[in-house]
């Protein structure tokens, strides 16, 4: 019997492999992305202290409306504004095992437009 590989399990394996290599610090925290079917979430995380410094998602009113890619761009811009307000200008981008395409790329582009460097 032929079985299809579970896409989410392979993504989680990729994410675990990458997380062993990258880590966020107070000077350069990690911008982590989580994508569900209907929403997208972004967090700026200091892994040394284990603290989330800023977060945004499509659950917030100002990030709703438009296509999913447009919403992702809005989330990227709002998380970047929150991070810059806390004097964070550089981050490490953690795509959480997702392909750098579609909503993940839109979020990254939105964050770059708002002034975050990675």
Swiss-Prot record:
Task: Report residue spans for region: Disordered.
Answer: 1-24
Is the keyword Cytoplasm assigned to this protein? no
- In what ranges is there compositional bias, type Basic residues? 10-20
Q: Name one Pfam family in it.
A: Ribosomal_L18p
Q: Which UniProt keywords apply?
A: Ribonucleoprotein, Ribosomal protein, RNA-binding, rRNA-binding
* CC annotations in GO: cytosolic large ribosomal subunit
Q: Name one GO biological process term.
A: translation
One GO MF term on file is: structural constituent of ribosome
Q: Where is the signal peptide?
A: none
The keyword Transmembrane helix is assigned to this record? no
The record ties this protein, via InterPro entries, to: Ribosomal_uL18_bac-type, Ribosomal_uL18_bac/euk
Described purpose of this protein according to its UniProt entry:
This is one of the proteins that bind and probably mediate the attachment of the 5S RNA into the large ribosomal subunit, where it forms part of the central protuberance.
Classification via HAMAP family = Ribosomal_uL18_B (MF_01337_B)
User: Which protein family is it in?
Assistant: Belongs to the universal ribosomal protein uL18 family.
UniProt subunit comment = Part of the 50S ribosomal subunit; part of the 5S rRNA/L5/L18/L25 subcomplex. Contacts the 5S and 23S rRNAs.
Protein name listed in UniProt: Large ribosomal subunit protein uL18
């Amino acid at each position: 019997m032929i079985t299809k590989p579970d896409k989410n399990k392979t993504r989680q394996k990729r994410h675990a492999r990458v997380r062993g290599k990258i880590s966020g610090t107070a000077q350069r925290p990690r911008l982590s992305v989580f994508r569900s079917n209907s929403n997208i979430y972004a967090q700026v995380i200091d892994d040394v202290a284990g603290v989330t410094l800023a977060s945004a998602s499509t659950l917030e009113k100002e990030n709703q409306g438009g296509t999913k890619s447009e919403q992702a761009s809005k989330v990227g811009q709002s998380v970047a504004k929150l991070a810059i307000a806390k004097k964070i200008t550089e981050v490490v981008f953690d795509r959480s095992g997702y392909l750098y395409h579609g909503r993940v790329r839109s979020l990254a582009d939105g964050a770059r437009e708002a002034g975050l460097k990675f």
